[in-house]
Amino acid sequence: MTAPITLSNLNHWFGSLHALKDVSLEIEAGEYVTLLGPSGCGKTTLLSVMGGFVDPTEGKILIGGRDMTNVPPAKRPTTTMFQDYALFPHMNLRDNVSFGLRMSGMGRRERHDRAKDLLELVGLFAEAGKRPNELSGGQRQRVALARALAVEPKVLLLDEPLGALDLKLRRTMQDELKTIQRKVGTTFIHVTHDQEEAMAIADRIVVMNEGRIEDQGTPTRIYCEPATLFAADFMGEMNHIPGRGTASGVETPFGILPLVAKEQDPAVVCLRPEAIGTGKGDVSLGPATVRDAAFFGTFCRAHLIPKADPDRVLIAHLPPASLLAAGDELILYTKAEDFRIFDVKE
């Protein structure tokens, strides 16, 4: 079971705080969408509005084509999975998973069979008789997911479900969430502030900032071709180079770059750290001195002082075998296609 969601012109105020500002969004049935943004951007408020825990001040919510704007949570085809999991400590896993089915009046045998199927789906069939305090954090997270899916919601809302897990377990659970979502086909809407998590699991990322949607698209598009400077910066490290449009390109401390901008208008030229290299490229950034460098396993992260702009620090992700030391001299290159340019106000 699954359903599309349509959000139309949502606005919400908490007193004088305008938490959601004209938010409109279409989510397809069976899609895995992440709401990504910093604390206070409105992503959790938007999730709460979809779940019925907050009534929007203005706007409309359709789920499966039906108006759910003022429908209470219990009567919506949605289930919300919170970060703290909220498992019942006195119940075993089977009873935790089947609790919602019991409340809906399903017979004992049928709900226990359903619970066993879901525990098998999340890899905990053999642990059905255990209680939550006998499980690891990752196992409790999987039980909470099984319980949320037991009532067969058309939409599953996940409020930072992996936030309490350590890095290694979080990455494992990212893979499991994506696999389980593909198997059940339910629409998943997942709130996170972690851009790597969003890229790992989402079909589509919705970047939020100050109550508005800044950008939305596939992880590849959002990372490689962000629509706004905020989205570019929030999706990962980004080097900023000041520029100004001219008839022949964009004038920067590194010379005229082959980019298009309005003449005389200021601009910010952006370049990802992994786009900077020491091999040949079609654009030279000239010589630079290593300020410091650190080994990150798959790359060497270096802070570089370019000769062309010594007051600026460039961040580069260079090959892990680079073995850089402070004071080393490098010649930097990049590709014209890796630049992104954004207009700015003086």
Language-model-detected regions and their locations in the chain:
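Non-catalytic connector elements of ABC transporters
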Residues: 238, 248-346
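Helix-to-loop junction immediately C-terminal to a conserved catalytic motif
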Residues: 51
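ABC ATPase nucleotide-binding domains
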Residues: 32, 48, 73-230
